[in-house]
Amino acid sequence: MAHRLQMRLLTWDVKDTLIKLRRPVGEEYASKARAHGVVVEDITVEQAFRQAYRAQSHNFPNYGLSRGLTSRQWWKDVVLHTFRLAGVPDAQAMTPVADQLYEDFSSPFTWQVLEGAEMTLKGCRKRGLKLAVVSNFDRRLEDILTGLGLREHFDFVLTSEAVGCPKPDPRIFREALQRACVEPAVAAHVGDSYLCDYQGSQAVGMHSFLVAGSEPLDSAVRDSVPKEHILPSLSHLLPALDLLEASSPMS
């Protein structure tokens, strides 16, 4: 006899799903540089950051843990590389800026909660769902969530730094399922990355919802994701859960 599916666990991405930076990275970096007497353009720093971040992520994935780095050192190297690419003559002299930026990005004042996030989390709690974070963030995430008033909504928080592997690696999702004592068939993940969040969670048998955000989805992604799995905003999650539970009977 078929029974209605009842979800038990929702895991969440954080950055650009529940929270976002108050100002673009380039603006934050350039502002701190100017405070130390170094004048650089926001857009130049933004472009340099993207290049430096990509290179660092490729050369030292997951904060370089397997190479003996700490996430703090990893980010410091990103900042110094960013300023070198932005044309700062003595980028090594920017070490105090790098240290300050690490602290600033640890502060809830650098971040803001996205519209609908808190209401949606409360709604999920009212349904009796377990909630957890599965994020490719570093060790600062717990403090940021606490400062923003969001930590209390989650049973536990998993970061790729703590677990030792980043999304879409299936091990981080399996760790969440194991901690929650939940089978993947009654768990779903919510995030804004097609590769890391949507495909990563589906690979272990979880359901998945893709947050579309402010930027339009790539047409190839949109064509490959059922429309009922796409959330134009977080306020669409609870109705999407209702539809999922109604349309996925369990034998």
Swiss-Prot record:
PANTHER family: HALOACID DEHALOGENASE-LIKE HYDROLASE DOMAIN-CONTAINING PROTEIN 3 (PTHR46191:SF2), PTHR46191. One of its GO terms (cellular component) is mitochondrion. NCBIfam families: DREG-2 (TIGR02252), HAD-SF-IA-v1 (TIGR01549), HAD-SF-IA-v3 (TIGR01509). It comes from Mus musculus. It holds the Pfam family Hydrolase. CDD domains: HAD_dREG-2_like. InterPro entries: HAD-like_hydrolase_domain, HAD-like_sf, HAD-SF_hydro_IA, HAD-SF_hydro_IA_REG-2-like, HAD-SF_hydro_IA_REG-2-like_cap, HAD_sf. Belongs to the HAD-like hydrolase superfamily. Transmembrane segments: none annotated. Keywords: Acetylation. This is Haloacid dehalogenase-like hydrolase domain-containing protein 3. The modification N6-succinyllysine is found at K15. It comes from the Eukaryota. The modification N6-acetyllysine is found at K15, K130. The keyword Acetylation applies.
